[in-house]
Structure formats: structure tokens, C-alpha cells
């Protein structure tokens, strides 16, 4: 990873510590997880990682508090629940309303979080993130999720006057593990569908 100059997402104190010890450039590290500890957030901020993905209003307050204690500004993205049902089965779908990851667009939580980040002295809004699941065949779910996130970005810009510097669209392209699985969609096909 380091030799190739790739970025890495981490989701625990152990993963973050390992990435840093392995020499991954902190500007290429993201911190995910819907139950981040103070220790994880503190290490992320002290190391100067690229961004922390916010999953709840509690995390908005938690990250603001820790950043204020350290005298730094935390780079954050808001993870959205787009309502998309995608993925090979319900256990790996990550964007519908009953999932523990992200803030709901449907209930207004996501908008509330972005507004709170805008008003926070120690948070720097870096954009919006969505991850719709894994083992996704076809392009439709990716395109629909992108439309939903872009529409929300326009609302954030229009109603809050806040630029949305980045949109991070996640989801795992399906893999044919068995002969019965459909032919996988290539990342190129997904990119083409998103470009139209």
C-alpha cells in the first residue's frame, strides 16, 4: 500500500495504529466506524489524517470536543444513509434506514449534522460520503445513490451556503465467487454509468 501510494480506510484504533506504523502517509488515511472512541479520534487528529467520517450527531459533538482540547481543526465528512437497498444480501447492505452506519437523509439527521459542523469552531467540512453495500451487480444502485447524494449536496449548498468540496461514493462491485453468480460489473462500467 505504501509503496504504491494508495490510501487506506481504517475502522478501529488497531487499524489506525497499524497504518501509521506501516508508514502510510496520514494524508491518505480515513477513519470510519460508528462507535469511535476518544482514543481513536485523538490519535487521528494528532497524526493529521485526511478525514474522519461522521456517523452520528454524538460524533459531531465528540470530535468537536476533542479537536478543541487539542487546539486543532478536524477534517470531517458526513456519512449518509441514502436509503438504497443494494448488495448481495441484507447482511452486507449498508445504506438503508435501519442500518447503524451514517446519518439519515429521510429524517433530517444528515442536514442537522452538516449545519452543526458548519457552526463548529473546530470542524472542517470536507464533504459527503455514502457507502451502499457490497457484492453489487449492475450500475443502477450506484447511479441512484449518486443522484441522491448530489441532490443533498445541492441542498446543503443552497440552504446553508456551504461548499461541498468532495463527494465520496462507496460500495463494493460484485465478484463472481461461483459459477451461479452473475457476470460482475466492471469498475469501468460503473464509472461510465456515473458519468452520464
Residue spans for each PLM region:
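N-terminal active-site wall of soluble small-molecule enzyme domains
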Residues: 1-49, 88
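Conserved, mostly hydrophobic/aromatic
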Residues: 1, 12, 44, 63, ...
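Acidic (Asp/Glu)-rich catalytic clusters
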Residues: 1-3, 19-26, 45-46, 67-71, ...
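C-terminal active-site-proximal or functional interface alpha/beta core segments in diverse enzymes
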Residues: 134-196
Amino acid at each position: 500500500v505504501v509503496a504504491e501510494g494508495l490510501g487506506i480506510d481504517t475502522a478501529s484504533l488497531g487499524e489506525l495504529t497499524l497504518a501509521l506504523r506501516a508508514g502510510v502517509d496520514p494524508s491518505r488515511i480515513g477513519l470510519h466506524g460508528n462507535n469511535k472512541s476518544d482514543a481513536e479520534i485523538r490519535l487521528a487528529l494528532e497524526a493529521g489524517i485526511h478525514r474522519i467520517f461522521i456517523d452520528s450527531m454524538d460524533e459531531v459533538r465528540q470530535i468537536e470536543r476533542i479537536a478543541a482540547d487539542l487546539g486543532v481543526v478536524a477534517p470531517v465528512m458526513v456519512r449518509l444513509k441514502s436509503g438504497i437497498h443494494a448488495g448481495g444480501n441484507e447482511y452486507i447492505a449498508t445504506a438503508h434506514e435501519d442500518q447503524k452506519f451514517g446519518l439519515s437523509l429521510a429524517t433530517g439527521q444528515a442536514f442537522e449534522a452538516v449545519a452543526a459542523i458548519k457552526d463548529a469552531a473546530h470542524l472542517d467540512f470536507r464533504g459527503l460520503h455514502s457507502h451502499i453495500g457490497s457484492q453489487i451487480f449492475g450500475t443502477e444502485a450506484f447511479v441512484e445513490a449518486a443522484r441522491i447524494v448530489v441532490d443533498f449536496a445541492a441542498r446543503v449548498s443552497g440552504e446553508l451556503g456551504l461548499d461541498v468540496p468532495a463527494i465520496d461514493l462507496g460500495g463494493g462491485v460484485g465478484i463472481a465467487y461461483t459459477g451461479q453468480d452473475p457476470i460482475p460489473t466492471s469498475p469501468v462500467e460503473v464509472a461510465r454509468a456515473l458519468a452520464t
